[in-house]
């Protein structure tokens, strides 16, 4: 397992739990507090055999600030670089190694993924859980013992709400994440 101290990973218990809403709030807050810090945002999607037709791995660099995709939202929030790794279950480690080779030595990494937690030990792992919880994603079940922090969110129409003070409590010291509770 690869240890990456300057990475904060965000997972979610189910779809539409507010993972990207939380991630973008953290990016915005970190850019205000640490304008000189390089922030790289990652989305890692592992495609399981039989469910998708992708083989190998592919890394996409998001450049469209107008995109409504999660990666576009991260770029709009202030990330300096946004990469999306899509890989099949047989090429996860190879894809992650290639992705990490493109990371800056200085700065911080914010990664959205449940499954990648089985391959990467981040400095901080946060799980976003819906208050009106439905069925947990299989990928969430496999990493439920790992989160340092669990955040509850609730749906309000089509938007997700959570306590915004939580994003403000995430700090960076020496390119490492710290939580001020």
Indicate where each model-derived feature is located.
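Short, high-confidence coil segments that cap the C-terminus of an alpha-helix
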Residues: 5, 36-37, 79, 104-107
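General beta-strand structural signal in soluble alpha/beta enzymes
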Residues: 9-10, 41, 83-86, 109-112, ...
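Conserved catalytic-core segment of NTP-binding enzymes
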Residues: 101, 105-108, 113-181
């Amino acid at each position: 397992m690869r240890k990456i101290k300057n990475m904060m990973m965000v997972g979610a218990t189910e779809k539409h739990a507010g993972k990207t809403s939380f991630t973008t709030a953290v990016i915005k807050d970190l850019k205000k507090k640490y304008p000189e810090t390089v922030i790289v945002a990652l989305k890692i999607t592992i495609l399981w055999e039989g469910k998708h037709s992708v083989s190998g791995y592919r890394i996409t660099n998001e450049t469209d600030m107008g995109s409504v995709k999660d990666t576009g939202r991260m770029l709009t929030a202030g990330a300096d670089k946004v990469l999306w790794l899509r890989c099949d279950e047989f090429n996860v480690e190879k894809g992650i190694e290639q992705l990490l080779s493109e990371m800056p030595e200085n700065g911080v990494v914010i990664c959205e993924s449940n499954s990648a937690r089985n391959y990467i030990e981040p400095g901080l792992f946060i799980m976003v859980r819906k208050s009106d919880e439905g069925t947990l994603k299989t990928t969430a079940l496999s990493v439920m013992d790992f989160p340092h922090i669990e955040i509850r969110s609730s749906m309000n129409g089509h938007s997700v709400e959570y306590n915004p003070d939580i994003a403000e409590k995430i700090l960076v010291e020496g390119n490492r994440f710290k939580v001020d509770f």
